[in-house]
Amino acid sequence: QGVPMPLLLVCEDNGIGISVRTPQGWIARTYGNRADLEYFTADGADVAEVLTVSQRAADYVRTHRRPAFLHLRTVRLMGHAGSDYEPGYRSGDEITADYGRDPLLGTARILVETGICTVAEVLDAYEAKRTDVLALATDVAELPQLDSPHAVMTPLREARDDAVRATREAASRADRRDDGPAVTVAQAINRALRETLTDHPEALLFGEDVARKGGVYGVTRGLAATAGAARVFDTLLDEQSILGLALGAGVCGLLPIPEIQYLAYLHNAADQIRGEGATLQFFSNRQYRNPMVVRIAGYGYQKGFG
């Protein structure tokens, strides 16, 4: 669609997914020759190389305003998770070889070889950081637990109750004269979306067929011409991508209005809504929020689709 997309995707490729190994060269073959996606790669164990290649990738994205893929070949240390017994499916030699590529050790090696630090200074810095981390862990472990429904719900409560209340009251007092021509529900929603796009320059509306076609029921017809292609645009037929874009736009200070075309497609994005959108405010203790308005068609022509 020609819309600038300055996006840098970073793949930390440790070559294994829990116990299943990635086919040799699969990442490079899959992403190395994609149209409109510039590919960069570096050895994740070599911090100097990572810095150089990362700078090149970032410069490309900023200069061309196009996406790039940064492939970092890394290692996985100490298994997939606390319950993962790595020696059950990997040999001791493989595990030991990974520790030889630990980027932390690689950084220490560079510091010593370039004369920036002595071995003793590196070890002292490491032990000092260990002390700091253990002290922080002790402090966190002693924090009060969430022991009541009120404590659990507090991070989810509206952070600006007064502003929300004032907006709700203003809407209830709005001029509701009905002496004009009757409109359909679709036309009323279209007007509301048009007013939102006009009054809020940070608002974006996107989804399947919402721009050029104007939605499968015509609800978004004409909005792309009003707000422009950068604010009202069609997406891939992928609900996870639609909601993922909305989540990212929300925390960037924008007002995303993603559309799920039919209710039957909602389950494709259930994890983004339940596992990300609905919990971000809780897990960040209200430091981050997801101010998105998810639109799903209702009163559709076919039972089960809206």
At which residue positions do the language-model features occur?
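Glycine-rich ThDP/TPP pyrophosphate-binding loop and its adjacent helix/strand module
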Residues: 1-135, 142
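Thiamine diphosphate
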Residues: 2, 25-26, 153-306
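A generic structural-conservation signal
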Residues: 9, 41, 120-121, 149-150, ...
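Flexible loop/turn segments at secondary-structure boundaries
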Residues: 16-19, 48-49, 76-80, 147-148, ...
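A broad detector of short, well-ordered amphipathic alpha-helices
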Residues: 52-55, 138, 218, 244
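A glycine-rich phosphate-binding loop feature that marks nucleotide/adenosyl-phosphate handling sites
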Residues: 71-78, 126-129, 150-160, 293-296
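Short coil/loop linkers at secondary-structure junctions
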Residues: 117-118, 146, 230
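Outer-membrane beta-barrel domain signature, strongest for Gram-negative TonB-dependent receptors
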Residues: 133, 137-139, 143-155
